[in-house]
């Protein structure tokens, strides 16, 4: 493991513990925990539903962030429970991390989760006609690649696993996400790109680097997007070229920039259940998804 990945894990763990300190799990959300969705030890997920209904609900699949080297479903439990309160069945999963596992493991595990959703929809009251997804930071990167796996046959041909048939998300939310590797501040010397040294197979870096750039694989079939960033996000410039690419292909999107001089908001602020603007952002994303419930 590189020093960059080690420092990433230590810093994120400390920040996440501070973020969630004192939070109490809501008593109006039911959670089914630690369901296996694949062959690997880390292939586990939780399902969240509002306690007030047993009806089939629209689905949100949450793809966690963490620079491809950190994170799991436990760190997103309060966030996903909060989404469920808005009337969704929420799927929160852990995927294999780098550097112990190499790309495309993150993408393969995400594909397995969507396959699990399709196969277990009736058991867990999930409406597969209305599946949505959210991803933040590296999770947004993985989610964008998954959507291209579903919509771009040329991109999909690079992998020996296939997307779930007829389960492209109706819309997605890309939150403080890595969307255009070529425009990351600092380029190849940036922290994000240094992490790629731990993510990509050593003998396939040259082959895989173009594959891991989400903007390169967008086409007219890419799903509608809610794209957000904020004033203190180190990836706040990422949406600019991505929005232009969506416009070129006629893909609908909604863009929101949060924060101002009196309200400084950092990377993935929406995960903080104590942050009023973060909760507003989550409200607006869920309202965006609900606009597709027709």
PLM features per residue range, with description:
Residues 1-294:
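Alpha/beta-hydrolase superfamily serine-hydrolase fold, recognizing
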């Amino acid at each position: 493991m590189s020093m960059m990945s080690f420092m990433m894990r230590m810093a994120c763990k400390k920040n996440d513990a501070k973020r969630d300190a004192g939070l109490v799990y809501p008593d109006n959300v039911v959670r089914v925990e630690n369901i296996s969705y694949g062959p690997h030890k880390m292939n586990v997920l939780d399902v969240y539903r509002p306690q007030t209904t047993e009806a089939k609900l629209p689905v949100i699949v949450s793809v966690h962030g963490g620079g491809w080297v950190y994170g799991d479903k436990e760190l997103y439990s309060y966030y996903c429970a909060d989404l469920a309160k808005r009337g969704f069945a929420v799927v929160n999963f852990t995927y294999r991390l780098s550097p112990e596992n190499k790309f495309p493991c993150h993408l393969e595990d995400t594909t397995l989760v969507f396959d699990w959703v399709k196969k277990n929809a009736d058991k867990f009251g999930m409406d597969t006609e209305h599946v949505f997804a959210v991803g933040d930071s590296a999770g947004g990167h993985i989610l964008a690649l998954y959507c291209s796996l579903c919509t771009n046959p040329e991109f999909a041909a690079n992998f020996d696993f296939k997307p779930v048939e007829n389960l492209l998300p109706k819309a997605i939310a890309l939150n403080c996400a890595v969307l255009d590797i070529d425009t990351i501040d600092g380029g190849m010397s940036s922290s994000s790109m240094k992490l790629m040294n731990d993510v990509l197979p050593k003998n396939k870096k040259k082959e895989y680097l173009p594959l891991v750039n989400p903007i390169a694989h967008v086409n007219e079939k890419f799903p509608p997007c809610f794209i957000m960033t904020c004033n203190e996000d180190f990836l706040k410039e990422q949406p600019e070229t991505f929005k232009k690419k969506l416009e070129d292909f006629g893909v609908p999107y909604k863009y929101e920039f949060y924060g101002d001089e009196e309200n400084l908001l950092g990377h993935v602020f929406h995960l903080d259940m104590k942050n009023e603007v973060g909760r507003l952002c989550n409200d607006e994303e869920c309202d965006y998804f609900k606009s597709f419930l027709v």
